[in-house]
């Protein structure tokens, strides 16, 4: 999962060049990389974790996936109710063997066969299971289980062969980026030799079976561990001038974003072990929308920017500098905020949606087809969250109607939105007034964590909320303002504070 991807760092060289160098002809580096037949086109999917206090029921969750045009998901287990609910849909599913089941499966062929029978044969093909991820970051999080990894993978594969499902369903295991060393420049990358005894036969297995190398890649952690060296814009897929592009001095290939460099590092690492025909599948990548005081770059703005640009990057099909002919598919971590996860705060804040399906923020993915309907939701509103104490809500309400310059005239005594006369109702109106005034901008519905976005019109009776379709030709009075909440302004200024690139040769650490 996300937190385990920041386990270790190693020193490497990072170059910033002011002049545009002539890129090497990357076509000579291309290889016959194998991709599953049904997934020849790159896609974006989502990880679905279940450490959520108010998660939708399986049936509701599937309806939500269909409404959002999400066609690829990765589960961290093989939940039977969810697999049943996914039957006869177009949603393609990666199911998982949790780390704590590796011992049983890796040491017993019959246990592996039983697992395939219960979790695959019982549902396929009505449920479109495309792959099995065996464990999660086993080499770096539970190294004591490493010797069981390949036996478990092979036992599961043999069980698929026995059921004649081995060509439709692939078997692999997700790795943390920290299994690679010297990842920039990518041309120098290699797998940690500690794991060669496992990686060599694993890669040979992936090559033989046409399965992908699964990698969990997080530019967020690269930035957090290398602040001041790796510019934020490079991590967020933001447009760069040539002087800010990362250049591999060995190949002269230009890298406009960190994720591409990490993917190419994986390809080079495989090539160094004489494997050149295995595709990289990014099984986790994302950016948290909230963090504690030590995580100032975990903001809604940065999460929106990263994930929106990531989606566009995948659907642009431009590949990587090393493999322009090959675009890796990506599973965003994650669909829902897992509010039950242990600290730090960011661990509970990777989701695009809250567990009840209301969006944490709205992605901006225009031009990416029908993917993610939340991008095309024209009518969204900002309301007070349930369960927030009245004192905290009152403070946020006071800011919205004061420094925030929301139009709060409708919640005054005798006006149309005064009833119900309670702080939650008044706060919702004031929050939404501010949100609409700010053009529903990313980050304008937070109020220190007590507000949330909803697609349900909160208008009631004669009380019409700003932005409502019920407004018709009614003119809403708003006050233009460039002010934002103090906390939001601080995080925004900080998040751009490390974007100045000094054109020197430096040594730094990267995942």
Swiss-Prot record:
Disulfide bonds: 382-445
Active site as annotated: 137, 284
The keyword Nucleotide-binding is annotated on this UniProt entry: no
GO biological process, one term: defense response
Molecular-function GO terms, alphabetical: glucan endo-1,3-beta-D-glucosidase activity
InterPro entries cross-referenced by the UniProt entry: Glyco_hydro_17 (IPR000490), Glyco_hydro_17_plant (IPR044965), Glycoside_hydrolase_SF (IPR017853), X8 (IPR012946)
Record key words, sorted: Cell membrane, Disulfide bond, Glycoprotein, Glycosidase, GPI-anchor, Hydrolase, Lipoprotein, Membrane, Plant defense, Signal
Mode of membrane association: Lipid-anchor; GPI-anchor
GPI-anchor amidated alanine: lipidated positions: 485
UniProt EC number: 3.2.1.39
Propeptide: 486-511
Signal peptide: 1-28
Enzyme class, broadest EC rank: hydrolase
Sugar attachment sites: 109, 192, 274, 374, 378, 407, 473, 480
Localisation: Cell membrane
Membership in a protein family: Belongs to the glycosyl hydrolase 17 family.
Protein's name in the database: Glucan endo-1,3-beta-glucosidase 1
């Amino acid at each position: 999962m996300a937190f385990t991807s920041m386990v270790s760092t190693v020193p490497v060289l990072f170059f910033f060049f002011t002049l545009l160098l002539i890129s090497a002809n990357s076509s000579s580096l291309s290889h016959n990389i194998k991709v599953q037949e049904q997934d020849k086109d790159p896609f974006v999917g989502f990880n679905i974790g279940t450490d959520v206090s108010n998660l939708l029921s399986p049936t509701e969750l599937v309806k939500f996936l269909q409404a959002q045009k999400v066609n690829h998901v990765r589960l961290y287990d093989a939940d039977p109710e969810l697999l049943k609910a996914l039957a006869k849909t177009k949603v393609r599913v990666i199911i998982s063997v949790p780390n704590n089941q590796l011992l049983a499966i890796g040491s017993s062929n019959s246990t592996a066969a039983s697992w395939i029978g219960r979790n695959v044969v019982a549902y396929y093909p009505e449920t479109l299971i495309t792959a099995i991820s065996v464990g999660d970051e086993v080499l770096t999080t539970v190294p004591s289980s490493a010797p069981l990894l390949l036996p478990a993978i092979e036992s599961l594969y043999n069980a698929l062969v026995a059921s004649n499902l081995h060509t439709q369903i692939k078997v692999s295991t997700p790795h943390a980026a920290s299994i690679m060393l010297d990842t920039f420049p990518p041309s120098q990358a290699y797998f940690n030799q500690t794991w060669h005894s496992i990686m060599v036969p694993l890669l040979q297995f992936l090559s033989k079976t046409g399965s992908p190398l699964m990698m969990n890649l997080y530019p967020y952690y690269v930035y957090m561990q290398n602040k001041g060296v790796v510019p934020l814009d490079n991590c967020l897929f933001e447009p760069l001038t040539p002087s800010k592009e990362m250049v591999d001095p060995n190949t002269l290939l230009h890298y406009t974003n960190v994720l591409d460099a990490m993917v190419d590092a994986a390809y080079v690492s495989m090539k160094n072990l004489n494997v050149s025909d295995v595709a990289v599948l990014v099984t986790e990548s994302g950016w948290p929308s909230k963090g504690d005081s030590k995580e100032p770059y975990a903001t809604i703005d940065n999460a929106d920017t990263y994930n929106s640009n990531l989606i566009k990057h995948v659907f642009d099909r431009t590949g990587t500098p090393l493999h322009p002919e090959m675009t890796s598919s990506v599973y965003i971590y994650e669909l829902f905020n897992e509010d039950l996860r242990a600290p730090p705060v960011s661990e509970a804040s990777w989701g695009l949606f809250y567990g009840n399906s209301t969006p944490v923020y709205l992605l901006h993915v225009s031009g990416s087809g029908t993917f993610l309907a939340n991008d095309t939701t024209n009518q969204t509103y900002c309301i007070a969250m349930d369960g927030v104490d009245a004192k905290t809500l009152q403070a946020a309400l006071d800011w919205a109607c004061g420094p925030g310059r929301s139009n709060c005239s409708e919640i005054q005594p005798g006006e149309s939105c005064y009833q119900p006369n309670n702080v939650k109702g008044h706060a919702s109106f004031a929050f939404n007034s501010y949100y609409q005034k700010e053009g529903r901008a990313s980050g304008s519905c937070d109020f220190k964590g007590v507000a949330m976005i909803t697609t349900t019109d909160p208008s009631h009776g004669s009380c019409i909320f700003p932005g409502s379709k019920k407004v018709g030709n009614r003119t809403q009075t708003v006050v233009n303002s460039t002010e934002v909440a103090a906390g939001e302004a601080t995080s925004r200024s900080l998040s751009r504070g490390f974007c100045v690139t000094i054109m020197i040769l430096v040594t730094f650490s990267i995942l």
